[in-house]
């Protein structure tokens, strides 16, 4: 039986955020193949001596020299930080899997220790980058400390170490192929449990539409802890709050959305972090979901989900990546165009 090892920072939650759902999708894909699926935590042994810790630190120093290269860490601060980050995990990973016939699924592409050590241990590496981190606004490379997008080449070189690479969007697949990586397109689709919920919402929406009267309503939805999403949500709030003659209601909700600058307006309702029940209630009621993001990488999972739920999506050009030219995804370039579409 094939052994699959995965280490992911995302909790496998079919009802969680986009990263968690993508992780569940990948897990369901592999478990369906009847493999030995190991969710690795890379935790240290509970009891270890000071001498053992010193040996690990020394081995880590040598591992970085051999497999990573100290020249990749720009500045003394980054070198010290790297040693502390890698110190205990590298030998643990290496000793545990050296010489074993395994396949390692690399999802958290900012986690370099597991990549380099699994490669050194002889594992087959399959990468599932949730997005190209170097192209996400505000992201900083942990080795060079470069700001996005100026460490794209570093990220590409790391992905070249992998045996297979599966990208979440058409655009990223195309870009990686231009760099000589034989990337394949593996789009997001909700885990089974989440898909069932969205199909239920679609059925309820179909019933509500038969009897709905009155003004329209739209939902601005997203996680305010995600920098591009937060920026886009705030831009939408600022725009709609400046409009004095809105003929429809705007709802704003999502994880930590209460931390946004919620400007008062008679036609805007702020719901903050939504319970599952409240989210379902809004998705059944509203006439569409509005999305705005600065240009970034990856693909928005909620566009797929809302299409399954029968929800029209109004997305700016940057947010609509991977979903252009679909009949129920309405793309706008300016807020003036958005108003016309609504």
Language-model segments: residues:
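Membrane-proximal helix-turn-helix segments that form the acceptor-binding/catalytic region
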Residues: 84-99, 113-114, 127, 133-134, ...
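Nucleotide-sugar-dependent
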Residues: 14, 228, 290-303, 314-325
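N-terminal subdomain of nucleotide-sugar transferases
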Residues: 1-50, 240-244
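A short, glycine/small-residue-rich beta-strand->loop->alpha-helix junction that serves as a flexible
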Residues: 8-25, 82, 106, 226-231, ...
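Active-site proximal beta-strand in glycosyltransferases
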Residues: 103-105, 118-138
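Donor nucleotide-sugar binding/catalytic pocket of nucleotide-sugar-dependent glycosyltransferases
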Residues: 134, 156, 160-206
């Amino acid at each position: 039986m094939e052994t699959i090892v995965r280490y992911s920072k995302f909790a496998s939650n079919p009802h969680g955020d986009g990263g968690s759902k993508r992780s569940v999708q990948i897990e369901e894909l592999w478990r369906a193949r009847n493999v030995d699926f190991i969710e690795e935590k890379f935790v240290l042994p509970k009891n270890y001596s000071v001498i053992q810790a010193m040996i690990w630190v020394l081995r880590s120093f040598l591992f970085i020299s051999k497999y990573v290269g100290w020249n990749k860490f720009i500045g003394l601060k980054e070198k010290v930080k790297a040693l502390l980050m890698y110190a205990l995990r590298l030998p643990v990973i290496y000793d545990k899997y050296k010489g074993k016939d395994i396949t390692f699924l690399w999802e958290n592409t900012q986690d370099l220790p597991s990549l380099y050590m699994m490669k050194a241990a002889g594992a087959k590496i399959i990468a599932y980058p949730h997005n190209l981190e170097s192209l996400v606004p505000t992201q900083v490379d942990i080795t060079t400390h470069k700001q996005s997008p100026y460490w794209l080449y570093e990220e590409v070189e790391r992905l070249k170490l992998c045996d297979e690479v599966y990208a979440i969007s058409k655009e990223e697949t195309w870009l990686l192929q231009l760099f000589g990586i034989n990337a394949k397109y593996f789009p997001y689709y909700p885990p089974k449990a989440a898909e069932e919920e969205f199909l239920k919402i679609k059925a309820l929406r179909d019933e509500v539409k038969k009897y709905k009267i009155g003004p329209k309503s739209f939902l601005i939805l997203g996680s305010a802890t995600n920098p591009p999403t937060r920026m886009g949500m705030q831009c939408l709030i600022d725009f709609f709050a400046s409009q004095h003659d809105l003929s429809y209601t705007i709802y704003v909700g999502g994880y930590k959305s209460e931390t946004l600058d919620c400007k008062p307006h008679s036609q805007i309702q702020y719901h903050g972090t939504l319970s599952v029940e409240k989210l379902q209630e809004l998705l059944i009621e509203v006439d569409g979901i509005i999305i705005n993001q600065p240009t970034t990488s990856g693909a928005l999972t909620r566009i797929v989900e809302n299409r399954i739920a029968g929800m029209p999506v109004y997305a700016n050009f940057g947010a609509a990546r991977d979903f252009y030219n679909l009949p129920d995804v309405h793309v706008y370039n300016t807020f003036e165009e958005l108003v016309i579409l609504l």
